[in-house]
Amino acid sequence: MSDDILKAFNDQITLELTADMTYRQLAIEADAQDLSGMAAWLRHQADEEIVHANKFIDHTLDRGSHPRIGTIEAPEVEVGLSALEIFQAALAHEEKAVSYTHLT
């Protein structure tokens, strides 16, 4: 695997794990407001991001390269968001992630 491709895969792995943490933090916010259905949906989204990261990790390892996870900062999620604001935050994060994926 070329260095450029490995870097792109490493960046994508980090992005997927960042998305996991963002969805989990949003799920915590939903749970804190007794929005259990919303929280469950957000946790499911977080779990999917872990699956995505693992696929990139496995693909990289299968090709004899060594994946590296980059720096993951704590998600910036405000306390007290409304249900609408939680979904808007999830959508904004997903749009950012998709735009990054299409640019690399």
PLM ranges: what are they?
Residues 9-13, 33-35:
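All-alpha RGS (Regulator of G-protein Signaling) helical domain and cognate RGS-like helical scaffolds
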Residues 1, 11-18:
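Short, contiguous, pocket-lining structural segments
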Residues 1-6, 71-92:
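Acidic/His metal-coordination segments adjacent to aromatic residues that form catalytic metal sites
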Residues 32-71:
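Conserved alpha-helical segments that form or flank metal/cofactor-binding pockets of metalloenzymes
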